Each structure stands twice: as structure tokens, then as C-alpha cells.
């Protein structure tokens, strides 16, 4: 069950961009209490993240119109307020409020 407030990232281990940003997802999980990862192919990816949702059946992905991973969504009052598709460092920084998130990574990678 997805939380109606906070940040949710849709991810999968088989996605090269998701693998690239695994440390980013781990950092967000530590810094943002209302953060969940919905994993499309491995319920243990990314490692070290407590709030993981197993979406191997893709039910949550379908309901949220996810076309590629990673997709980061900010929910407010139970509704989608904003989304970033792929790794967009500025977009992820804006949604998470972490100003140095992804330092050392490329500025953009498609999902």
C-alpha cells in the first residue's frame, strides 16, 4: 500500500539508471521519512531501504501511469503533486529538498 503523502520512486534492478542512482535512493530513504521505493522486479532493491513495496505484478505502476524507471513522484493530500521521470539531478533535488543530492553523478540520465 502506498502512502498518501511524501515521495515515492518507482524503480527496478534491471534498469541501468536505477542501478546508477541506488546510492541516491539510499540517501533519500535516510533523509526523508515519508519515502517509499516501489520495486518492479526485485523486492530487495535498492538495498538498505526499509520502505520497499513489491510491485512485480506492476499493479502500483499501472495505477500510477509509470512508463519508465526511475520515476520519482511527490504526493500531497493523497494526490500526485509533481513527478520527475529518469534521473534529473535538479528535479530530484527540488522534490527531496536535498541540495547536494547526486553530486558526482551525471546531471541527467533517461529512464
Describe every region a protein language model picked out.
Residues 2-25, 34-36:
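Short active-site neighborhood of thiol/selenol oxidoreductases, capturing the structured segment around
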Residues 13-14, 42, 79, 88:
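Short, glycine/serine-rich, charged loops/turns that create anion-binding
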Residues 22-25, 51, 87-88:
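Short, glycine/charged-enriched secondary-structure capping and boundary segments
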Residues 25-26, 42-43, 62-63:
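Short, flexible, glycine/charge-rich loop motifs used to bind or transfer phosphoryl groups or to couple energy/partner
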Residues 28-30:
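Short, acidic, metal-binding catalytic loop of nucleotide-sugar glycosyltransferases
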Residues 32-57:
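Thiol-based oxidoreductase modules, predominantly thioredoxin-like and allied folds used
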Residues 63, 67-109:
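Non-catalytic, surface beta->alpha helical segment in thiol-disulfide oxidoreductase systems
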Amino acid at each position: 500500500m502506498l502512502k498518501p503523502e511524501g515521495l515515492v520512486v518507482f524503480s527496478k534492478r534491471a534498469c541501468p539508471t536505477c542501478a546508477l542512482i541506488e546510492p541516491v535512493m539510499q540517501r533519500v530513504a535516510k533523509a526523508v521519512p515519508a519515502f517509499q521505493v516501489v520495486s518492479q522486479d526485485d523486492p530487495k532493491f535498492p538495498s538498505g531501504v526499509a520502505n520497499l513495496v513489491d510491485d512485480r505484478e506492476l499493479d502500483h505502476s499501472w495505477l500510477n501511469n509509470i512508463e519508465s524507471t526511475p520515476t520519482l513522484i511527490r504526493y500531497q493530500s493523497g494526490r500526485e503533486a509533481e513527478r520527475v521521470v529518469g534521473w534529473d539531478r535538479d528535479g530530484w533535488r527540488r522534490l527531496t529538498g536535498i541540495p547536494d543530492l547526486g553530486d558526482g553523478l551525471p546531471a541527467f540520465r533517461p529512464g
